[in-house]
């Protein structure tokens, strides 16, 4: 009977940004800035086919890309480029993955099952089996934040294996448990395998991988260094570990630096060239070239954004900046959006507005002592420019520079005017609020 293809990856890559500031993270959304932000390639072109009923071990040193590969297969992390084909429902088990620290173990069981689309009746029917399998006992009603790593792994494993997934991804979940629970988990995994389910087993334990897995993928600093039968791959891996463990500490550090440097300096162009060289431009090379370009085309969030989307994002950022400035300046949002030109002038040109009339007479905010004193001052120093024609009463014209905290009513009151009179002299304040630095015309009315 021919086995069904369950998982296929073609030239999977995963690039992570090493941006340290928010501005750098924002730059990664736009291709014009992307080359200026350092990156790190956790995967550098991983291709493998996995069939139903297979248990695949994923091994490698720390930082080799094991968890990144398992997260992409489980749908947690999107790939940067390459093709991923999944035929079936995937469930991932890692230490504490998806658990809410503030909820109890029992509440986490219900929450995760609900998130997977199960109904309360279905959950009630199997929650006791999950609790019994987890071996947590009375601790099932304690907050998960009080659990040890082994207890968290037991809970996560118990929930996942009771979901009946087609593809099970186990990321170090059995490495922290005791031998009794490991044997129970192993028995469950073998039962899944007999049912034709596919299992990905990520582990540092060569013994566990040797006991469980049919084939092994050896990850090495983002590369799939080898993929094949467990016996042959583990023989190569043990030989590598023997050499590596005999390195001095400086030699190990140098080896790790070289591997990580290659991950930082990797590019999709390099991957294209390497694959095309292997193809040797044989018959059908045009098709091969087309496929290689397709699978090595970056598929990042910023590249998916259309010009319109990017323009909208820039507009949104400008709007946030504009609203922030109006808030700092004490301008209402209604005014800011109804009269944007005047608002921008208030925000960016207050000093210039204040300096329009350097010879203007700046009056104080205090109310004049009396109309009589004003009349005496006018009689002593009459000004022909301050006496309008065809007016029976004497009037003095002056200016006032608006200060912080002023209002139209306060200025009018302090200078013996009504609001209507002040608005008549300064019609621009009828619709647009006053702002600090604005120069207003005043006419103090006297009898």
UniProtKB/Swiss-Prot annotation:
Q: Which PANTHER family match?
A: TEICHOIC ACIDS EXPORT ATP-BINDING PROTEIN TAGH
Instruction: Please report the stretch or stretches of sequence annotated as the ABC transporter domain.
Output: 24-246
Give the keywords, sorted: ATP-binding, Cell membrane, Membrane, Nucleotide-binding, Translocase, Transport
Q: Which reaction does it catalyse?
A: ATP + H2O + teichoic acidSide 1 = ADP + phosphate + teichoic acidSide 2
- Please tell me where ATP binds in this chain: 60-67
Taxonomy of origin reads: Bacteria, Bacillati, Bacillota, Bacilli, Lactobacillales
Annotated region (Disordered), positions in chain: 359-393
- Protein name, per record: Teichoic acids export ATP-binding protein TagH
Q: Main role? A: Part of the ABC transporter complex TagGH involved in teichoic acids export. Responsible for energy coupling to the transport system.
> Which protein family is named in the record?
Belongs to the ABC transporter superfamily. Teichoic acids exporter (TC 3.A.1.104.1) family.
Q: Where in the cell is it found?
A: Cell membrane
The yes or no answer to whether the keyword Translocase is present is: yes
One family name in Pfam for this protein: LysM
Species this chain originates from:
Enterococcus faecalis (strain ATCC 700802 / V583)
Q: Which InterPro entries match?
A: AAA+_ATPase, ABC_transporter-like_ATP-bd, ABC_transporter-like_CS, ABC_transpr_TagH-like, Bact_Polysacc_Export_ATP-bd, LysM_dom, LysM_dom_sf, P-loop_NTPase
Composition skew (Polar residues), residue ranges: 360-369, 379-393
Complexes and interactors: The complex is composed of two ATP-binding proteins (TagH) and two transmembrane proteins (TagG).
């Amino acid at each position: 009977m021919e086995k069904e293809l369950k998982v296929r990856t073609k030239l999977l890559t995963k690039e992570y940004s090493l941006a340290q500031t928010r501005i750098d993270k924002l730059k990664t959304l736009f291709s014009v800035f992307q080359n200026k932000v350092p990156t790190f390639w956790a995967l550098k072109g991983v291709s493998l086919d996995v069939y139903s009923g297979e248990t695949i071990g994923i091994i490698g040193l720390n930082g080799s890309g094991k968890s990144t590969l398992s997260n992409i297969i489980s749908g947690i992390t999107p790939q940067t480029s390459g093709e991923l084909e999944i035929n079936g429902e995937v469930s991932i088990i890692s230490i504490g993955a998806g658990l809410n620290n503030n909820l109890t173990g029992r509440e986490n069981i219900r929450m995760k099952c609900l998130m997977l689309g199960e109904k309360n009746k279905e959950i009630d029917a199997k929650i006791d089996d999950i609790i019994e399998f987890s071996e947590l006992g009375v601790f099932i009603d304690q907050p998960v934040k009080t659990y040890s790593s082994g207890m968290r792994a037991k809970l996560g494993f118990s929930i996942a294996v009771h979901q009946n997934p087609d593809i099970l991804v186990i990321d170090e979940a059995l490495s922290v448990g005791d031998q009794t629970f490991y044997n129970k988990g192993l028995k469950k995994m073998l039962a899944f395998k007999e049912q034709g389910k596919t299992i990905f087993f990520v582990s540092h334990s060569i013994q566990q991988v040797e006991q469980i897995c049919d084939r092994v993928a050896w990850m090495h600093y983002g590369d799939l260094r080898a993929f094949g039968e467990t016996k042959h791959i583990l023989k190569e891996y043990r030989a590598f570990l023997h050499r590596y463990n005999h390195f001095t500490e400086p030699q190990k550090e140098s080896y790790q630096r070289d591997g990580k440097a290659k991950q930082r300096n990797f590019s999709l162009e390099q991957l294209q060239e390497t694959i095309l060289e292997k193809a040797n431009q044989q018959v059908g090379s045009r098709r091969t070239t087309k496929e290689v370009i397709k699978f090595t085309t970056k598929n990042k969030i910023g590249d998916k954004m259309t010009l319109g989307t990017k323009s909208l994002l820039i507009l949104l950022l400008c709007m946030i900046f504009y609203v922030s400035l109006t808030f700092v300046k004490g301008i209402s949002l209604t005014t800011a959006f109804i009269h944007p030109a005047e608002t921008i002038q208030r925000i960016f040109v207050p000093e210039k507005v204040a300096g329009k009339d350097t010879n203007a007479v700046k009056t104080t905010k205090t109310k004049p002592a009396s109309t009589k004193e004003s009349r005496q001052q006018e009689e002593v120093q009459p000004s022909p420019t301050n006496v309008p024609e065809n007016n029976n009463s004497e009037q003095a014209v002056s200016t006032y520079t608006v200060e912080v905290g002023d209002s139209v009513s306060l200025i009018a009151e302090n200078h013996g005017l009504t609001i209507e009179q002040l608005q008549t002299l300064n019609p621009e304040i009828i619709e647009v609020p006053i702002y600090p630095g604005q120069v207003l015309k005043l006419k103090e009315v006297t009898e």
